[in-house]
Amino acid sequence: MKILAGICDASAFLGTIGALNEIVHTSNDLDDLKQWAGSNYTGEQKYIAKQAVRDKNVITANGTAPMEFAKEILIALNVAAEEKILDWYNFHKLGFYTAPMPQM
């Protein structure tokens, strides 16, 4: 499976090529995305204010969401069982002293 992914201003670049017009997506900010992407971006109704979004084979995230972005990519690529990926994510997001050590 091929995926297309963009985080931070790379998600805005996806808007400039029209890749976000038909899918649910996010970016740093809707106004910022519209300014960067210009007239090629017509997907405003599909924008949601969320750390990371996966719709079909396209993954987008804002610049403060590298963990969420990585999690969505790993799930999309099916590199491990989703439960294992979520364990990894929770361990790194919540920290060594809060989350249990993931069992890979």
Enumerate the predicted regions with their spans.
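Active-site-adjacent pocket-lining segments in enzyme domains
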Residues: 1-5, 9-104
